């Protein structure tokens, strides 16, 4: 049986700014306090094989914490983000958290695959064959993650968040983070999310079955609590994991695999990417030969100039969060070796984000913004989640545009 979602069109709160060069549009599509939820967090965004945008997030009750009651909700746009259908509850969490929606677009079958967790203890899989209008019943795939118990005694699991990827081989790849719960930072009644490691999970049959890969980023005195990870396939076929961590270096961790499953390289810190201890997102915009240039984007809060820090001092195993402000998108033309383009898309409070590209070449960033009044500027308690849409001309102040012969970008899978 399939769950049928019925939609009506609804226009979100929108603003289109007149720019000297390029196109730039912002829409608030989730607002704190609406529909019985305290706040909305944890952005996931994909552009489907047909070009629809699907925006998933965590609708949080209580005080918006990780262990409060959480539903997974979704909104859908079929016109490049100009109009958004009403919010639908995709996964009701009940009294427990359901979170970390991680969609993957399958360019071969046209399906959208979705992984998510419930109570940080079980992982489920669903798929849609009609651009998110209907979804299959949940399938429990926790047994796949059990395969990592031989190398790590986890008690907490979570995919993504953000989106997973499809490789040119057709393989689907999703990063997971696992924790042994030892720190108990949420108190005695909840399993902790620290320490943690990052692992890979994959499917070679379009989501019909899933397999455990290998540990991509272990936890040690260098990597320091690696967890939420974004990923991308490079032009040479390697898969890059870009990982949040709590090292006092305040830099992202990068590790590479030849196939997205095993053979992960020793993680290294990326000087180009400031790490405020927050999820950051990646997406490919174009790739030779279908387009004239290779282009990759990365987005996170670049708050390196912000003086705010938590009261506790940094230690080798405990770096305090930096303020989540100054959401910045960067672009690389050489598969991540250098990042010459940088532009702030929100100078205010902004946290988790996810990126997607529609066939018209527009780039879309779905992100958390603002702080609820009376919370002392707490960046974990967002007032809204917005989608900002822009083109290459806006991002580069007119220095870069698609070439005349460029094809709409699609993962060039061969199966």
Identify the role of each PLM range.
Residues 8-17:
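Hydrophobic h-region of N-terminal signal peptides that target proteins for export
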Residues 6-7, 414:
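Intrinsically disordered, low-complexity repeat segments enriched in small/polar residues
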Residues 19-415:
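Asp-box/BNR beta-propeller blade signature and adjacent active/binding-site loops
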Residues 1-4:
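Positively charged n-region of N-terminal signal peptides that target proteins for export
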């Amino acid at each position: 049986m399939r769950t049928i979602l019925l939609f009506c069109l609804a226009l979100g709160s929108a603003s289109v700014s007149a720019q000297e060069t390029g196109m730039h549009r912002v829409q608030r599509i989730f607002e704190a306090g609406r529909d019985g939820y305290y706040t909305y967090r944890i952005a996931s965004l994909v552009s489907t094989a047909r070009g629809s945008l699907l925006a998933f997030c965590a609708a949080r009750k209580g005080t918006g914490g990780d262990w409060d009651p959480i539903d997974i909700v979704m909104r859908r746009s079929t016109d490049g983000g100009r109009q958004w259908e009403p919010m639908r509850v995709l996964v009701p969490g009940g009294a427990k958290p359901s979170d970390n929606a991680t969609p993957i677009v399958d360019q071969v079958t046209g399906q959208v695959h979705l992984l998510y967790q419930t109570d940080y203890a079980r992982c489920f899989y669903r798929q849609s064959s009609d651009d998110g209008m209907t979804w299959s019943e949940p399938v429990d795939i926790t047994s796949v993650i059990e395969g990592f118990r031989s190398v790590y005694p986890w008690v907490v699991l979570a995919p993504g968040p953000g989106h997973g990827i499809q490789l040119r081989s057709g393989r689907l790849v999703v990063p997971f983070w696992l924790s042994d719960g030892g720190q108990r930072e949420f108190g005695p009644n909840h399993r902790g999310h620290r320490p943690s490691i990052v692992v890979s999970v994959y499917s070679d049959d379009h989501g019909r079955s899933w397999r455990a890969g290998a540990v991509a980023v272990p936890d040690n005195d260098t990597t320091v609590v690696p967890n939420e990870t974004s990923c991308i396939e490079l032009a040479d076929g390697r898969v890059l994991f870009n990982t949040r961590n709590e090292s006092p270096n305040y830099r992202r961790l990068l590790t590479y695999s030849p196939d997205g499953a095993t053979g992960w390289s020793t993680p290294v810190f990326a000087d180009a990417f400031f790490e405020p201890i927050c999820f950051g997102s990646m997406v490919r915009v174009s790739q030779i030969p279908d387009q004239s240039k290779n282009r990759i984007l990365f987005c996170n809060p670049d708050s390196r100039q912000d003086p705010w820090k938590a009261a506790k001092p940094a230690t080798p195993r405990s770096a305090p969060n930096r303020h989540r402000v100054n959401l910045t998108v960067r672009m690389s033309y050489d598969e991540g070796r250098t990042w010459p383009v940088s532009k702030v898309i929100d100078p205010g409070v902004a946290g988790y984000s996810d990126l997607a590209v529609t066939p018209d070449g527009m780039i879309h960033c779905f992100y958390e913004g603002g702080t609820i009044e009376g919370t002392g500027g707490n960046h974990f308690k967002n007032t809204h989640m917005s989608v900002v849409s822009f083109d290459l001309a806006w991002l580069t102040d007119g220095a870069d545009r698609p070439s005349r012969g460029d094809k709409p970008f699609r993962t060039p899978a061969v199966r």
